Amino acid sequence: ELITLKALKILQAADVVAYPAPADGDSLVRSIAAPHMSGDQEEIIISTPMVTERYPAQDVYDEGAAEISAAVEAGKNVAVLCEGDPFFYGSFMYLFARLSESYAVQVVPGVTSLAACSAELALPLAARNDVVSVIPGTLDEEAMEAQLMASNTAAIIKVGRHLGKIKNVLEKIGAAERAHYIERATMENQRIVPLSELDGVSAPYFSMIIVRRNGEILDQ
């Protein structure tokens, strides 16, 4: 339902549909787009390993870009699927960097994970002169604390195995009670839990923590 009309038109007109898929599983983004695909479109699967090292992930994008390039050279229109927005921490950026100098690439904006999580939490992000920060959970504790203290609203992404560290930082600065945790936003298995009730030190890939300095946006 959150596919834009523009993206839908491009998807349905494409000769080829390319998308990332984990090396050991099914593609979430394809499952979202599947009801809107014609059924006779060619597909390019970009098998992406979830690794912290830059390589071999970059090799995968080299191969994916080469397959897309071959399809374009054959006169075919290619649509590349991406969860959320392609330029907001999206893997599409790596394909764009490889293809945009040689071909006309149209980037269609999408609904970001930040917007989706904010809406599902019924938590406005900013008003007036508020500063909003997007903070990767991969930061060290000192850097994360500094970013949190400098923001009216902070969205912590890439929670994953960094959950324990993130909780420690939020507790240290007295923000744990104002932190809103959500995983798999807008999906059927969406889950919203108070941060204090989260056990363990890891979270799913699709998870986010949003925290406001003053709790509510209208109390300023």
Predicted regions located by residue number:
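A contiguous loop/helix-start segment that scaffolds small-molecule binding in enzyme catalytic cores
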Residues: L148-Q220
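A generic local secondary-structure boundary/capping motif
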Residues: A7-L8, S69, A122, A143-A146, ...
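General beta-strand structural signal in soluble alpha/beta enzymes
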Residues: Y19, I45-I46, V80-C82, V107-G110, ...
